């Protein structure tokens, strides 16, 4: 997470720094991205950067968290549209999310993220790390989501298990997306419709089960 000094910056300067980070991590994968390029694009001294962030990894994960805010709002909207049907909401949200990630404004950035980021890092991006601030934000997000779920449409009767189900769904989503980018990187591109079918199939398994 950024240091307190970052949050005391004027909004224009914070946005400029985030835009510079997006530009650099879109240009190159994490390992090849450069703090020097970020500060040059943002127009700030190197010393100032380290007053705001610990290192390149710190700004990388905060950038993803910042971008994820808008993506995450979509799940709430789809769940409301589905009248609290969790699986239907997840299905519509993930279908929409795939389009945004693969063909949207930040498509090149997400390609770098999923191709070059290991699974542990991907999980951290989705669920947050052990730092209290991340943990509290994840709790806040779930506190908005859980009341929208119609419990009459699922057999799970407690919040802990619902959260676990959502994490299972998103873990599979990220694995499928990572596989898509991995194939794309080796010139064996998988049609996006096939990726959507894979995600929908797993959601069907979660909804209906697989045992006869």
Residue spans for each PLM region:
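Amphipathic alpha-helical segments that line or abut small-molecule/effector binding pockets
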Residues: 84-107, 167, 196, 200-207
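Amphipathic alpha-helical packing segments from all-alpha helical-bundle domains
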Residues: 84, 88, 111, 120-156, ...
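Short, leucine-enriched amphipathic alpha-helices that occur as contiguous helical runs
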Residues: 10, 14-22, 56
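Helix-turn-helix
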Residues: 16, 27-58, 62, 66
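Amphipathic alpha-helical segments used for helix-helix packing
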Residues: 92, 100-128, 132, 140-143, ...
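Alpha-helical structural segments
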Residues: 20-23, 27, 41, 58-81, ...
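C-terminal peripheral helix-coil segments that are non-catalytic and often amphipathic
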Residues: 143, 147, 151, 167, ...
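N-terminal intrinsically disordered/low-complexity leader segments
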Residues: 1-9
């Amino acid at each position: 997470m950024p240091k307190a000094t970052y949050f005391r910056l004027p909004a224009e300067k914070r946005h400029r720094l985030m835009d510079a980070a997006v530009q650099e991590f879109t240009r190159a994968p994490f390992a090849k991205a450069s703090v020097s390029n970020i500060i040059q694009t943002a127009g700030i001294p190197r010393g100032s950067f380290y007053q705001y962030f610990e290192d390149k990894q710190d700004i990388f994960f905060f950038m993803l968290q910042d971008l994820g805010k808008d993506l995450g709002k979509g799940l709430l909207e789809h769940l409301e549209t589905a009248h609290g049907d969790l699986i239907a909401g997840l299905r519509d949200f993930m279908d929409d999310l795939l389009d945004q990630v693969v063909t949207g404004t930040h498509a090149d950035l997400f390609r770098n993220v999923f191709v070059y980021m290991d699974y542990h890092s991907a999980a951290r991006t989705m669920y947050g790390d052990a730092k209290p601030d991340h943990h509290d934000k994840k709790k806040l997000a779930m506190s908005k989501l859980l009341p929208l779920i119609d419990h009459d449409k699922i057999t799970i009767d407690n919040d802990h298990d619902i959260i676990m189900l959502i994490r299972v769904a998103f873990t599979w989503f990220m694995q499928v997306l990572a596989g898509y980018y991995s194939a794309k990187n080796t010139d064996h591109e998988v049609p996006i419709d096939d990726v959507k079918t894979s995600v929908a199939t797993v959601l069907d398994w979660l909804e209906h089960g697989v045992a006869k």
